[in-house]
């Protein structure tokens, strides 16, 4: 059955500066900052949390249903979904703006300067989670426009669809009351360790307390160290999986969440879902971009 993935679709333009930002940006001159970086390499990737999650879920054999917005330049993304055999019925095209864009410059110290244009993402809230669909088994509220995240969470709850609250980099947009409302509406919460600390600070609740509630689990990713799973106040550590090589961490969290949705939709135990997520995250980090890793289902015994 389909998993409804609410989140962003974006194009990532990634460049490399063959020097150090520290040698180009003088601390005593930042008040008159005017710099230009020659970037001899450039690549464009399909990105955005919803797109990345959907890619992994589809590779695993799941059925992603993306709810997001693209701009007038979004035809390539729509064609990509159609090539997968994925439905675009909930992807809105906003003709008077661009698809969300991230423009990233990385230096030789792996420092990054990023400019982000939200574009069509600001209209994502105009598409609503359907209330009468019996075929949608599970959902996720991933980073998106602020209004979209608030409304889609409430709509999932009203429709009775279990969903993962995955605030990601969108977490700082919300205050404690709003985050508590998200948690009350959600079935699971997924964060990284930094986001987990911020969530606890803003809600005034520990991970133990958050999990000792109606939630079926709180998942905290720890990078190479694996993952913590909190259920009814009890913590379980699921070890990480060593990557063949570390090439690009972009989209690792999204790959993990695609695997998480795959397992949850099939009724797996949460720790088993997380184990698969750790394996897929290790696979993804060895590839550039968020949608280029290839998953061998037979090797995963799926």
Model-derived segments and spans:
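Short, conserved aromatic-histidine micro-motifs
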Residues: 30-37, 75-76, 139, 275-288
């Amino acid at each position: 059955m389909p998993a409804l993935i609410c989140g962003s679709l974006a194009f990532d333009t990634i460049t490399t500066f063959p020097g150090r930002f520290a040698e180009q940006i003088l601390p005593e001159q930042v008040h008159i900052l005017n710099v230009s970086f020659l970037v001899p390499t450039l690549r464009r990737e399909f990105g955005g949390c919803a797109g990345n999650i959907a890619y992994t879920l589809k590779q695993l054999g799941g059925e992603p249903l993306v709810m997001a917005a693209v701009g007038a330049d979004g035809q390539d993304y729509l064609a990509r979904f159609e090539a997968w055999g994925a439905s675009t019925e909930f992807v809105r095209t906003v003709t008077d703006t661009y698809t969300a864009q991230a423009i990233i410059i990385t230096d030789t110290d792996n420092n990054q300067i990023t400019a982000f244009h939200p574009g069509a993402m600001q209209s994502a809230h105009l598409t609503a989670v359907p209330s009468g669909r019996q075929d949608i088994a599970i959902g996720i509220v991933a980073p998106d426009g602020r209004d979209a995240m608030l409304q889609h969470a409430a709509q999932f709850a009203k429709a009775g669809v279990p969903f993962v609250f995955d605030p990601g980099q969108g977490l700082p947009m919300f205050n404690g009351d709003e985050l508590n409302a998200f948690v009350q509406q959600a079935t699971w919460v997924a964060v990284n360790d930094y986001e987990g600390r911020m969530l606890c600070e803003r809600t005034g609740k520990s991970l133990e307390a958050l999990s000792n509630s109606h939630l079926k689990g709180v998942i905290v990713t720890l990078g190479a160290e694996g993952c913590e799973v909190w259920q009814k106040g009890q913590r379980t550590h699921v070890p990480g999986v060593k990557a063949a090589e570390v090439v690009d961490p972009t989209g690792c969290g999204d790959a993990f969440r695609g695997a998480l949705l795959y397992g949850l939709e099939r009724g797996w135990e949460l720790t088993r879902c997380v184990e698969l997520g750790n394996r897929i995250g290790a696979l993804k980090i060895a590839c550039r971009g968020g949608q280029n890793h290839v998953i061998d289902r037979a090797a995963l015994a799926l």
